[in-house]
UniProtKB/Swiss-Prot annotation:
Protein name: Polypeptide N-acetylgalactosaminyltransferase-like 6
Region entry Catalytic subdomain A, spans: 139-248
Transmembrane annotation, as ranges: 8-28
Recorded name of the encoding gene: GALNTL6
Organism: Homo sapiens
Glycan-carrying positions: N141, N588
Membrane topology per record: Single-pass type II membrane protein
Disulfide bond positions: C130-C360, C351-C427, C466-C483, C518-C533, C558-C573
Residue ranges that the Swiss-Prot or TrEMBL entry lists as coiled coil: none
EC nos: 2.4.1.41
Length: 601
């Protein structure tokens, strides 16, 4: 009997140990990934654990093998670089370097571009978790397609060098440069000779000016890679940028993926993240591209994980080649540029695919100061946008026409082939897109604009003059001027109609037709200027009180003026001062009271 009890106790002990130990075997790789791979502290020599970055593979619970794709030798080599512009630091500029001639041909400071290294180093500004991520061992290769027209020599070369230096060679099937009928000599034989050193680079040239959309289509039609990756010709890809993109496509080939697009300053070439960094792509109902916060419902436990985005910014993305052509590529009826990012975004979501932004993939992009070349005559961004709206947006196109009535009578050209494609692909309607994908967009950009609190001219009581923004842009200081309705001359030069809208900001223009600039003030005593509207309140939040003062909560001050000098500025609130009293031409008291109740609650 005792022997049986002893044997029973032994078996029970073994079973208990098994219960404790065996489940944790499966957890080992998770523990190892989380705790055994450590990033260096600032100033500490980076060391890399055995098995990471040396081709060793790791099996996941889904049975797929993954590896670390980082090139640590290259990373350490870049860390040792020094010089002007290295590590993405701004180039030190003198007064002469700001001369407009440096911008004239390219829309960015070509002098700076010519004076920083073609293989300059960049800061690794990824989320820390990106440094430990593994991606599939077997990733598809890609054709990288780069259209260009009259691009600067060094900006184009820097794009290519960054790709070659920061991309695993096995993942590059080819790099296709598509020359859209450039005229500059350095982009002809000189470019051919330079690119001959790169075995995977080939140059394709158009026979006439085709525009960005058709040059991308031309490059895609000649591509051999399993994936198409589109980049602009003035970019710099960052560390380990490609594997995170290809990984998403390998997991689901009906996926379009976009990198985080960082900003390379057009003046000093400093490299930094966009304001807000990881945000969802969106649009307003005039079809301007916007970025909105990721809602809590879509935020991942790991902020470095890919997240869904309704629309892409446009120029930088990757897509499975076969899936791209199943979707019909770009609509070939779109001219030059504009609207294509909406067309491909709506199409992929409505026709059975999905789109993600990938925080662990980062690419710097020069946002030009202005477009340096002429768009061929007869082309129209408005026509492109209407063509997309009529093909994909169904009854929601009406919201665009309400804000852009001039679009109603534009010709879209023949869209029957696009309508038939949508039918063949069994695509969902735009109402589904707004409900299932872009459900958070109306919170920031409602299709039906809520009524404003006040609009029309803003007249100062003391001066009997009106606020005038003179059709200015960001940085323009507001001034007082003779009110147009009082018989001011040269009315075309004035801009005296403003809207105090539902966002509680003040914009030039009438309701439904406001411009994208807002009254902005930094602090007490600062001038009141126009600044790009950001919709995040802050410096652009205003209140219109019963004493007719325009109150600025952030600075705890009121809008004031100097009638003699016609200046407008912020000052300590004094409700008895007539220079701080402003009269809106039209007021909706119901909305205004709601604003004030919200401000006081």
């Amino acid at each position: 009997m005792k022997r049986k009890q002893k044997r029973f106790l032994q078996m029970t002990l073994l079973f208990t140990v098994a219960l404790i130990f065996l489940p944790n075997v499966g957890l080992w790789s998770l523990y190892k990934d989380k705790h055994l791979v450590k990033s260096a502290e600032p100033g500490e020599q980076q060391t890399f654990p055995l098995g990471l970055g040396d081709g060793q593979f790791y099996s996941w619970t889904d049975g797929l093998r993954r590896k670390d794709w980082h090139d640590y030798e290259s990373i350490q080599k870049e860390a040792m670089r020094s010089g002007k512009g290295e590590h993405g630091k701004p180039y030190p500029l003198t007064e002469e370097d700001h001369d407009d001639s440096a911008y004239r041909e390219n829309g960015f400071n070509i002098f700076v571009s010519n004076n920083i290294a073609l293989e300059r180093s960049l800061p690794d500004i990824r989320h820390a978790n990106c440094k430990h991520k593994m991606y599939l061992e077997r990733l598809p290769n890609t054709s990288i397609i780069i259209p260009f027209h009259n691009e600067g020599w060094t900006s184009l070369l820097r794009t290519i060098h960054s790709i070659i230096n920061r991309t695993p060679g096995s993942l590059i099937a080819e790099i296709i440069l598509v020359d859209d009928f450039s005229e500059r000599e350095h982009l002809k034989d000189k470019l051919e000779e330079y690119m001959a050193r790169f075995s995977k680079v080939r140059i394709v040239r158009t026979k006439k000016r085709e525009g960005l959309i058709r040059t991308r289509l031309l490059g895609a039609s000649m591509a051999r890679g399993e994936v198409l990756t589109f980049l602009d010709s003035h970019c710099e890809v960052n560390v380990n940028w490609l594997p995170p993109l290809l990984n998403q496509i390998a997991l689901n080939h009906k996926t379009i993926v976009c990198p985080m697009i960082d900003v390379i300053d057009h003046n000093h070439f400093g490299y930094e993240a966009q304001a807000g960094d990881a945000m969802r792509g969106a649009f307003d109902w005039e079809m301007y591209y916007k970025r909105i916060p990721i809602p809590p419902e879509l935020q991942r436990a790991d902020p470095s994980d890919p997240f869904e985005s309704p629309v892409m910014a446009g120029g930088l993305f990757a897509v499975d080649r076969k899936w791209f052509w199943e979707l019909g590529g770009y609509d070939p009826g779109l001219e030059i540029w504009g609207g294509e990012q909406y067309e491909i975004s709506f199409k992929v979501w409505m026709c059975g695919g999905e789109m993600f932004d990938v925080p662990c993939s980062r690419v710097g992009h020069i946002y030009r100061k202005y477009v340096p070349y002429k768009v061929p005559s007869g082309t129209s961004l408005a026509r492109n946008l209407k063509r997309v709206a009529e093909t994909w947006m169904d009854e929601f196109a009406e919201y665009i026409y309400q804000r852009r009535p001039e679009y109603r009578h534009l010709s879209t050209g023949d869209i029957s082939a696009q309508k038939e494609l949508r039918k063949q692909l069994k695509c969902k309607d735009f109402k589904w897109f707004m409900a299932a994908v872009a459900w958070d967009v109306p919170k920031y950009y409602p299709p039906v604009e809520p009524p404003p609190a006040a609009w029309g001219e803003i007249r100062n009581v003391a001066a009997n003059l009106c606020v005038d923004s003179k059709h200015g842009a960001t940085g323009t200081e507001l001034r007082l001027d003779i009110c147009v309705k009082d018989g001011s001359e040269r009315t075309w030069s004035h801009e005296q109609l403003f809207t105090f809208g539902w966002r509680e900001d003040i914009r030039p223009g009438e309701p439904l037709h406001t411009r994208k600039f807002c009254f902005d003030a930094i602090s007490h005593n600062s001038p009141v200027t126009l600044y790009d509207c950001h919709g995040m309140k802050g410096n652009q939040l205003w209140g219109y009180r019963k004493d007719r003062t325009l109150f600025h909560p952030v600075s705890n001050s009121c809008m004031d003026c100097n009638p003699a000098e016609k200046k407008i500025f912020m000052a300590r609130c004094d409700p008895l001062s007539e220079t701080q009293q402003w009269i809106f031409e039209h007021i909706n008291m119901t909305v205004l009271e709601k604003f004030n109740h919200h401000a006081n609650s």
